[in-house]
From Swiss-Prot:
Transmembrane segments: none annotated. It comes from Acinetobacter baylyi (strain ATCC 33305 / BD413 / ADP1). Its main location: cytoplasm. This is Translation initiation factor IF-1. Belongs to the IF-1 family. Residues 1-73 form the S1-like domain. One of its GO terms (molecular function) is ribosome binding. The gene is infA. It holds the Pfam family eIF-1a. SMART domains: S1.
């Protein structure tokens, strides 16, 4: 399990909505990752749409997947 200090945080834009609350996100460095919504965002019913600016946390062990932790207004 990765510690909070080991997580890498990127900003990106949601390019596609996928089934099961998964999203394709284009990061600021040009890479595309598959990301899911964090638990607190699910709990508070925060909706994410295509084109939203988001923050994505990623573990250094798998840079193709991430967790969306924040949606910019």
């Amino acid at each position: 399990m990765a510690n909070k200090e080991e997580l890498i945080e990127f900003e990106g834009v949601v390019t596609e909505t996928l089934p099961n609350t998964m999203f394709r996100v284009r990061l600021e460095n040009g890479h595309e990752v598959i990301a899911h919504i964090s638990g607190k965002m699910r709990k508070h019913y925060i909706r994410i749409l295509t084109g939203d600016n988001v923050k994505v946390e990623m573990t250094p062990y798998d840079l193709s997947k991430g967790r969306i932790t924040y949606r910019a207004r």
